[in-house]
Amino acid sequence: NYLQFKIPVSIGDVTRVHLGNSMCLLAGLLFGPGVGGLASGIGAGLYDLFDPVYIVSAPYTFCSKFAMGFLAGLLGRAAFRKEGKSRVLQVILAGVVGQLAYIFLYLLKSYVTLRLVGTASQAAFLAVIPKIAASTVNAVAAVVISVPLSIALRKALSRTAFFSVMNVQKENKGYFNPVTIALTIFCCAVTMVFAMYLSATNKIKAEDQKKIDT
């Protein structure tokens, strides 16, 4: 995340071209959906907490990055059981699906945030367009970096004791277990609180503007 180019947008915060997503995908592909998703979400969330521009978005960042790492890990675990070209193609697919999920959640959050603070629908949509381009660049870079790295690292780590803690062992295939249910509830709660915060902020701004006008 610290290797980045910030791009100002007409309304709202800024958008960035960076390499952070590649590490989030790599975490999912190496460690599986649970551990990889948490590593992705916690790492990205901590970055936002230490950046004044993004500190308010940190909880939502955790949720969206967790989703990216979780999906990449879920599909990647099945892919690494295969061999040859089939494995490579499925690992690429895992990375692409993880990135698409994140892009959707990120753009949705950006649009909803602008709407909640009183931005007109068309203006909010126009403000999101530059983020689509930046997100696409980030996604392509993330897949290009994380896929070969994950394959190479798994091969190297297979010769070490560390390999035993990766996602190669048999795991509980019932994904609707207490952990995933709790994380889902947490993500929904964070999203609701974030929306309520923005709504309250917009109300305060509207009241202040009314006082100024009168």
Language-model segments: which ranges?
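Loop-helix junctions at membrane interfaces
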Residues: 1-214
